[in-house]
A protein has these predicted regions:
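Short, conserved active-site loop motifs that form the nucleotide-linked donor/cofactor pocket
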Residues: 74-76, 173, 238
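Alpha-helix/helix-capping structural signal
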Residues: 4, 29, 119-120, 254
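Dinucleotide-binding Rossmann-like beta1-alpha1 core, especially the glycine-rich loop
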Residues: 1-28, 200
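General small-molecule cofactor/ligand-binding pocket signal
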Residues: 24-26, 76-78, 213
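Helical element adjacent to the flavin cofactor pocket in flavoenzyme catalytic cores
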Residues: 7-15, 39-111
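C-terminal lid/capping helical subdomain adjacent to the catalytic/cofactor pocket in oxidative enzymes
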Residues: 25, 38, 88-90, 146, ...
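Active-site substrate-recognition segment that forms the wall
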Residues: 39, 83-93, 107-236
Length: 269
């Protein structure tokens, strides 16, 4: 919706095509043909970048199902455990100090350890002297019941001007975005919440039941370069898989597979 942002998007699309990514520049009419819901904001559009291979889904459902499948393969999950610190001896981590759900302390020992605590990773790594430049960037989402309304988009969309995304999840519309630097607080800023809803109905007046909006906030583990920290550390049995920023689910399976290869002594790929 912003000509300058669209121009930047066109430049970024050209760069990504050089690396094999599918990014097609589309006119306003072409955008509306791909997603008819955009007809309600046609006069606000500058153009679009379309990726046929893009997909979207429900990250919570994916994670829940993945855990269920992992349990079926013999993985044991220890829920409601508070992790206090890592123990180490020389260049080797020797255990994880925890408090279990019965409030009893215990130390879990393993052959290898993976630090995958997102924004909270620095708290355990700092005492070990492992560099970990991660800061929490709070993001917001609003989930709106479509409830028979016909104006919600079917195609996943990104508003480059406002840095928010629209994703249809069955009979719900998920709107997410913003970046708030407020430490580890997960309190909802109602001004930001309302901004998401207001922008949604500016673009898609018949998107759903405005009063049904449910809000959520989470902490994105951001690094200065926006590149995640995946790989070995100075400790021979401690590995990192953290700092994925806004692309945690996008990169989850790929970085997990790459790290598994590294831990097994194989070349990732």
């Amino acid at each position: 919706t912003d000509p300058k942002e669209f121009a930047h998007g066109v430049e970024a699309a050209a760069l990504m095509r050089q690396f094999g990514c599918d990014r097609d520049v589309k006119s306003v009419d072409e955008c509306v043909a791909i997603e008819p819901a955009l007809a309600s904001c046609r006069d606000k559009l500058a153009g679009g970048i379309f990726t046929l291979s893009d997909e979207s889904g429900d990250a919570q459902r994916f994670t829940t199902e993945l855990a269920r499948m992992a349990e079926g393969k013999g993985v044991t999950f220890r829920w409601n455990m508070a992790v206090e610190s890592l123990t180490f001896d020389g260049d080797k981590v020797t255990g994880v100090r925890c408090v279990n759900e019965e409030h009893r302390k215990e130390v879990l020992a393993a052959d290898a350890y993976v630090m995958a605590l997102g924004s909270y990773s620095p708290f355990l790594l700092k005492p070990l002297g492992v560099p970990c430049l991660i800061y929490p960037a709070k993001g917001y989402s609003a989930t709106i019941a479509i409830d028979g309304h016909r104006g919600a988009p079917m195609v996943s969309l990104t508003d480059l001007a406002w840095k928010i995304v629209f994703t249809r999840l069955g009979d719900r519309l998920r709107v997410a975005g913003t970046a708030e630097l407020s430490g580890y607080s997960k309190d909802l800023n109602l001004v930001r919440c309302e901004a998401l809803v207001r922008r949604t109905f500016e673009l898609f007046p018949d998107a759903g039941d405005r009063e049904s909006a449910q809000f959520w906030t989470g902490l994105r583990p951001a690094t200065p370069s926006n590149v995640p920290l995946v790989g070995a550390t100075r400790y021979r049995n401690l590995y990192l898989d953290t700092g994925h920023g806004t692309l945690g689910w996008t990169m989850a399976c790929g970085s997990g597979r790459a790290l598994a290869d590294l831990m097994a002594g194989r070349k990732p790929g």
